[in-house]
């Protein structure tokens, strides 16, 4: 796996040191060994996991530096993009948020076995966490690879993001229609579309995009709405 990691990361324009390679190898072994128990991912082949999960998660680093930032990964699942970003940027302070207890148990094991510091795992819905004072408007940057519309994701992210912070959403190449639908939500939540970065994964694994919003105003106190409402009645 070491040679593949080096090759794929180099093709993506990122260098990777031996210690980080070893962490990715351990993460892969945990992901595969615990997959059946926790139902973590449908992607299990070595090349696919390296490119579609590990490498894709680190696409943010082509766009910006994350050193010493306070970040939350919303709907992290098996730890993407949060854990690959933490491996690549040890100085990142990270909260991994997921609503499923079994996934959080897996994440706690990964954090423990990889000896990752300044990483917290919380089993909670974003709609609830966004209403808790210790977390509201706390984070410098928020991420999500979760499968949901942009306008829905913005309601999860904006309440947790500090003024001037950035929300980075991982999307496919055809995101224009979603962005148009999200214009009203962004305005109501104090967010503004900053940029969309398109990129291609190596090994013919397809095109992706990073959608970046900046927070310009405080999010009104009535957001986020109750759990389930953002998906049922998007802004």
Swiss-Prot record:
Give, as one word, the top-level EC class: transferase
What Pfam families does UniProt report for this protein, alphabetically?
A: GidB
What's a Gene Ontology MF term here? rRNA (guanine-N7-)-methyltransferase activity
What does the entry list under GO cellular component?
A: cytosol
Q: Which InterPro entries match?
A: rRNA_ssu_MeTfrase_G (IPR003682), SAM-dependent_MTases_sf (IPR029063)
Where does the chain bind S-adenosyl-L-methionine?
75, 80, 126-127, 145
Signal peptide segment: none
Q: Where this protein primarily resides, as one coarse class? A: cytoplasm
Role: Specifically methylates the N7 position of a guanine in 16S rRNA.
Q: What is this protein called?
A: Ribosomal RNA small subunit methyltransferase G
């Amino acid at each position: 796996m070491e040679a593949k990691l080096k090759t794929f990361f180099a093709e993506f324009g990122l260098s990777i040191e031996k210690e980080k390679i070893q962490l990715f190898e351990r993460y892969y072994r945990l992901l595969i060994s615990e997959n059946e128990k926790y139902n973590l991912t449908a992607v299990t082949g070595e090349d696919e996991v390296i490119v579609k999960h590990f490498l894709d998660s680190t696409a943010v680093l082509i766009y910006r530096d994350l050193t010493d930032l306070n970040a939350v990964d919303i709907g992290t699942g098996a730890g993407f993009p949060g854990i690959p970003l933490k491996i690549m940027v040890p100085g990142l302070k990270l909260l991994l948020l997921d609503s499923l207890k079994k996934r959080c148990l897996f994440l706690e094991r990964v954090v423990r076995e990889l000896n990752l510091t300044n990483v917290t795992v919380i089993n909670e819905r974003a709609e609830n966490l966004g209403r808790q004072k210790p977390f509201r408007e706390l984070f410098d940057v928020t991420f999500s690879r979760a499968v949901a519309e942009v306008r829905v994701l913005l309601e999860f992210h904006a309440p947790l993001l500090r003024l001037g912070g950035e929300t980075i959403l991982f999307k496919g190449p055809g995101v224009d229609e979603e962005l148009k639908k999200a214009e009203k939500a962004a305005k109501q939540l104090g967010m503004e579309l900053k940029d969309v970065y398109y990129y291609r994964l190596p090994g013919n694994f397809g095109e992706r995009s990073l959608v970046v919003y900046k927070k310009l105003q405080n999010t009104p106190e009535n957001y986020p709405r109750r759990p389930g409402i953002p998906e049922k009645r998007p802004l």
